[in-house]
A protein has these predicted regions:
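N-terminal intrinsically disordered, cationic/polar leader segments
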Residues: 1-226
């Protein structure tokens, strides 16, 4: 929680912050269509208990989803990191910021082109952040799909040998620099969410396997819903 403190108050009412969040989360008879809607309800509840003109609530959590391995068709659970922030200032609309972080991989095309097809591969981390009003925020699954498609290949928690063989083949058929991954995230996000008013940020981090450093690329774009 972050709120501004009215001038007439000496300090914040700490218990009211916790109380407003606990009441909303503990209400088992209320179903929220999204994390963002839950955060709105918490801030609305807090506004009834504690005066503020600007408030912010932030959740950091792991988001689990299922997929199928590419050859053996085994069901596997994947997990990605999510940061969700909702802000409210005076009478302006609620603004949300959602960041999703997904693990994939990169294959160095420069080394491959100059080394008879031999190259280094490594895990990579892709991030997509979106900022917008409630109706504009995409579903988490669609954001995950954008990031996963931006790597040399998807990665999986569970892989049988036949899956490993295909993933390795796909990686080497699609060598990408970390800058390519970042550009892919932004391009695919633009195509997927062009009908929404969003500010979007992308980051790709390559956990270099033969270097003693990581490589990071970042980018930004804005869609205007038309």
């Amino acid at each position: 929680f972050t709120i501004d403190l009215p001038a007439e108050l000496k300090g914040v009412h700490m218990s009211r912050l916790v109380e407003s969040m606990t009441e909303e989360i503990s209400n088992q008879f209320r179903v929220h269509p999204s994390i963002e809607e839950l955060q709105i309800k918490i801030l609305e509840g807090l506004a009834q208990k504690h005066p503020f003109s600007r408030g912010e609530i932030k959740f950091e959590f792991e988001f689990g989803y299922t997929t199928r391995t590419p050859v053996s068709n085994k069901r596997t659970w994947e997990v990605c990191n999510v940061t969700a922030i909702t802000r409210k200032e005076n009478e302006t609309p609620y603004i949300h910021e959602v960041e999703i972080e997904v693990i994939g991989n990169t294959v160095c095309p420069h080394c491959m082109a100059n080394n008879d097809g031999l190259t280094h591969i490594q895990r990579a981390i892709g991030k997509l952040s979106v900022i917008g009003e409630t109706a504009a925020v995409p579903k988490y699954g669609s954001m995950i799909d954008v990031i996963e498609k931006s790597f040399s290949s998807k990665t999986y928690s569970l892989l049988k040998l036949e899956d490993e063989m295909l993933v390795t083949k796909q990686m080497h058929e699609n060598p990408l620099l970390v800058e390519d991954v970042c550009r892919n995230i932004l391009q695919l996000a633009k195509e997927a969410f062009s009908d929404r008013d969003l500010e979007m940020f992308a980051e790709a981090r390559s956990l270099e396997s033969i270097h003693k450093h990581d490589v990071i690329a970042q980018g930004r774009l804005v869609t205007n819903g038309y």
